[in-house]
UniProtKB/Swiss-Prot annotation:
Taxonomic source organism: Staphylococcus haemolyticus (strain JCSC1435)
Source taxonomy: Bacteria, Bacillati, Bacillota, Bacilli, Bacillales
Protein name in the entry: Putative cysteine ligase BshC
Enzyme class, first EC level, given as a word: ligase
EC number of the protein: 6.-.-.-
Superkingdom of origin: Bacteria
GO molecular function: ligase activity
NCBIfam families assigned to the protein according to its UniProt record, in alphabetical order: thiol_BshC
Keywords from the UniProt entry: Coiled coil, Ligase
Keyword Metal-binding: no
Length: 537
């Protein structure tokens, strides 16, 4: 496999500012992510003292998996106080979307680099957001049908979607297998299809909960990299979190205050508001089979979906006796993650690293240091056919990845069309505009007639536009093979008007490139970069 790093002009000004060490942005973070000194400082930070307990919790959590030598070594290193590079994601159907795998590759790449540079093990850790309850975000994925040049949605269907954490949800195996079959029906048959299908079927049959199925797939793919996995909703992990959970409850008012103030500061500095939440407590409680947001009202802690109330003392007692019923929201989750781990760097998606800026003073209030915050690496895969089509139409791959195919397709159609016809239609439209302007001048004193002429002009202009549009559409129909090929390029390189990794599923890449495509022996060696990476066979 070939790997090419390509520099694009960054569309996201936030990422550009981060790369350029913009002071107005960095004031909301505690470390500059592009300075070597930041990593040196973080590597020297004293440990938090929770590493032995944490290593045992992860070992227990992964006990139902066959661990590799590198994973066992990383658990031992973690126990001895090794620093980590960490990132996380919700448990998407069949591991999707593709950027989930790219997050893990980013974590692996950076941890490996730091291990070499500092001569001590830095452990790659992936945090499964099993505490999340928004099932609509994880119950579907997309598959590209190359034969039809169509991108199709595949969904896990259930009449009773969970209202609690996805970690507590046990999906119907038959429905999962049905979704898997629908996915594979759309894939082209390759030498990798049958073993890949068997891998997925075996995982679905062996594991029961939604996040355990997700965990097993990630393990199968990334075990040789030594990646350690942990579910945010793990009961033993929640036991370890009790001290900070209690702090969050007792300091909920101050936490909310500094969060809102920092958010106002980020907005005033020109950043877009990322976190939308009405709560003033920033914790959830599992009650009546539902994950319910806690808020403070009239000196009582209330739940979002029931009439049950708690005093502060009762909540503290509940944390002590049943901590597994609690979970963090978007404001407290990052702080909890960093309280648990001795982290050098956190790797997240563009939206994630933006909302961490709004939490700077929450970290400080709870005396938890924010790690170095970095965006995940962006990767796009090019199949041989994609390369062939790009060459056939003399297209720039970087342009198509970033902007899509519309401009190139329209240029192609215009070249096939009659310049004379288009020019005459445009001239005719211009002549009519002149005539209508004269008519409007004649009737400007009479509002009814003025409106009549204006409306009539709109009708005629629409007809001219329709004529030109239909003419060009007929050109497209005459070149239907080329139009299909342009659509194919768009769905592969710029699906749904965005990056491939935001829509495509990892199984698609494994089916095309090989079931071991993401393993260290196959995947091209990477160095962490802000730039776009293009990967081809």
């Amino acid at each position: 496999m070939d790997c090419r790093v390509t520099h694009f002009k960054e569309k996201d000004s936030f990422i550009s500012k981060l790369k350029e060490s913009d002071k107005s942005l960095l004031e909301f973070y505690q470390y500059n992510p592009v300075e070597t000194a930041s990593f040196t400082t973080k590597m020297k930070r004293p440990n938090n003292g929770r590493e032995k307990q944490l290593a045992q919790i992860i070992k227990d959590y992964m006990a139902d998996l066959k661990l590799t030598t590198s994973q066992l070594e990383h658990i031992e290193a973690l126990e001895q106080g090794a620093k980590v590079v960490i990132g996380g994601q919700q448990a998407g159907l069949f591991g999707g979307p593709l950027y989930t795998f790219h997050k893990i590759l980013s974590i692996v790449t950076l941890s490996s680099q730091l291990t070499k540079e500092y001569g001590e093990t830095v452990v790659p850790v992936f945090w499964i957001a099993g505490e999340d309850h928004d099932f609509d975000e994880v119950n579907h994925t997309y598959v590209y049908n190359a034969k039809e040049a169509q991108l199709k949605k595949v969904k896990y269907h259930t009449m009773t979607p969970p209202e609690t954490n996805v970690s507590r949800y046990t999906p119907d195996k038959e429905a999962m297998l049905n979704a898997l079959n629908l996915f594979f029906e759309e894939l082209k048959e390759t030498n990798h299809s049958k073993p890949l299908y068997k891998l997925c079927v075996d995982i679905i049959n062996e594991f029961d909960t939604w996040t355990d199925i997700f965990k097993a797939l990630l393990h199968a793919v990334f075990k040789e990299h030594g990646v350690l996995l942990i579910d945010a909703q793990n009961d033993k992990l929640r036991q370890l979190e009790k001290p900070l959970l209690k702090q969050i409850v007792t300091n909920h008012s101050k936490i909310n205050q500094v969060f809102r103030q920092t958010q106002e500061q980020t907005i005033a500095s020109g950043l877009t508001q990322m976190i939308q939440t009405d709560t003033n407590v920033h914790l959830f409680l599992h009650e009546d089979g539902m994950r319910q947001l806690i808020s403070k009202e009239d000196n009582l802690f209330k739940l979002s979906k029931s009439d049950i109330t708690y005093s502060e003392e009762e909540l503290i007692e509940l944390i002590e006796t049943e901590p597994e019923r609690f979970s963090n929201n978007v404001v407290t989750r990052p702080v909890m993650e960093e309280w648990l781990f001795n982290t050098v760097a956190f790797i997240g998606g563009p939206s994630e690293i933006k909302y961490w800026a709004e939490l700077n003073n929450v970290f400080k209030l709870l005396n938890v240091e924010m790690p170095i915050v970095l965006p995940r690496m962006k990767m796009t895969y090019m199949m041989e056919r994609t390369q062939k089509l790009l060459k056939q139409y003399s297209l720039n791959v970087e342009k198509v990845i970033q902007n899509g195919i519309d401009d190139d397709k329209n240029e192609f159609v215009r070249e096939k069309a009659s310049d004379t016809f288009i020019q005459q239609v445009e001239e005719l439209k211009a002549k009519h505009e002149n005539v209508y302007q004269q008519l409007l001048n004649e009737v400007k004193e009479n509002q009814d007639n003025f409106n009549l002429v204006t409306k009539n002009e709109e009708i005629h202009n629409k007809q001219f536009d329709y004529l030109l549009k239909r003419y060009l559409l007929n050109i497209e129909r005459e070149n239907d093979i080329s139009m299909r090929q342009f659509r194919e390029l768009d769905l592969v390189l710029h699906p749904h008007h965005g990056l491939q990794e935001r829509i495509w599923n990892p199984l698609q890449i494994m089916n095309d490139f090989g079931i071991d495509v993401f393993s260290p022996s196959t995947f091209p060696p990477l160095e962490y970069t802000f730039d776009q990476i293009i990967i081809k066979p």
